[in-house]
Amino acid sequence: MEPGPSVSPGPSRSFKEELLCAVCYDPFRDAVTLRCGHNFCRRCVSGCWEVQTTPSCPVCKERAVPGELRTNHTLNNLVETLLREEAEGARWTGRRSPRPCRAHRAPLTLFCLEDKELLCCACQADARHQEHRVQPIKDTAQDFRAKCKNMEHVLREKAKAFWALRRTYEAIAKHNEVQTTWLEGRIRDEFDKLRDFLRVEEQATLDAMKEESRKKHLQAEEKMKQLAEQTEALAREIERLQMEMKEDDMTFLMKHKSRKRRLFCTVEPAPLQPGLLMDACKYLESLQYRVWKKMLGSVESVPFSLDPNTAAGWLKVADDLTSVINHGYRVQVENPERFSSAPCLLGSQVFSKGSHSWEVDVGGLPTWRVGVVRVQAHAQAQAQADVGGEGHSHSCYHDTRSGFWYLCRTQGVDGDHCMTSDTATAPLVQAMPRRLRVELECEEGELSFYDSERHCHLYTFHAHFGEVRPYFYLGASRGDGPPEPLRICHLRVSIKEELDI
């Protein structure tokens, strides 16, 4: 059998790769060129720009202008030619004469599914393949091409997933740049406040010291002036006494009584008064401690902050990280710790030992939850929510059985109720609390809730909590007014002074 006409070699692999879009990894469809020189499918690059704040090239990140997209006719023609040649090559390959078997020189027309080898009719009768499943090459190739097509689809989907993940990392990087600038400003502002406070205290201390110095100087000047006048009076008296002693005896004796009274009335020198020196102890004694103690009155402290990295898209955390509002859903940068399907967030601290307490002002929020969540349970709930998709309710996993312990305000047909995460418990109180105190005893395994305004106990959970974080849910506000916040109450700081023994 003569071999068929030779087939011209197809395009090289590197050339084919140059005709693939960097976004979809398929041959270009309606190729367009950006100002930077990179080429993409028009639909692909437009899709990328829909999720970008500022349009840029998906490859080099150079800023792009959507109106400057230029259709690349040359590239489109090359892709069309390549696809046509590959189709013709595939048809010719199907018409070529089959290769002969090396052992029997017979046409290879069968395929062994067990050994994955090409066979001729003589090979099929061989003992090595007698019990094996074989089928015609054409049928096998068709089946394998279908499998490869599926694998190609899987790989393309995986490549798209990698590209989407890359865009997510780009969004995270940009978010971190903005966050870094914002954090730098906030940190500088906070330290500026401390420096301003210290400058004011320094100036007040210096002013007080200078005022005392001025008063003591005036006091010393007044005393020196009095002493100068008294010294001058004594000098005149001494001069007068010397003159009288030069008089004759009769005159001298006649003035004795008046002279004695006059000398008796002269002023005696007064002793030095205490407190004339500058009081160094008054200004330097524990100066730093006294200023720090005074600073506590102007410094606000909270048991923990609200973690914005866990806040769902509905929530906006205040700049001081102590309050949060529900302003409706807005797209946030992806983060595996972020709640995805319910308006929830966590506190910044992880508690596993000791006693901890905090107060939360829920005000008149129509729906809320306040409590703790086991760290591992939060990760598991996030994974289940991601598997469930967009329509899945993340909130359905938030109960005691799955590691969430909280009090909540819920809306029912017969009014609002204060409930717990344990669905077996009945509503707790008729009067809805506005300020909750939470007390966590890790070693005792107790989580207690109190109404801070009414000073009454509401409920206590008993469980082995493990590592937990504060947990909050914030429903949408009622009416058209501004959204009402949920706040972490500030601590009352006190100082206990003890001897260092």
UniProtKB/Swiss-Prot annotation:
List the GO molecular function terms. transferase activity; zinc ion binding
Q: Where in the cell is it found?
A: Cytoplasm; Nucleus
Q: Using the UniProt record, give the first listed, main subcellular location.
A: cytoplasm
Keyword annotations for this protein, in alphabetical order, are: Acetylation, Apoptosis, Coiled coil, Cytoplasm, Metal-binding, Nucleus, Phosphoprotein, Transferase, Ubl conjugation pathway, Zinc, Zinc-finger
Zinc fingers (B box-type), renumbered ranges: 96-137
CC terms in the record's Gene Ontology section = cytoplasm; nucleus
Record's protein name: E3 ubiquitin-protein ligase TRIM35
| Upper taxonomic lineage | Eukaryota, Metazoa, Chordata, Craniata, Vertebrata
What would be the name of the gene that encodes this protein?
A: Trim35
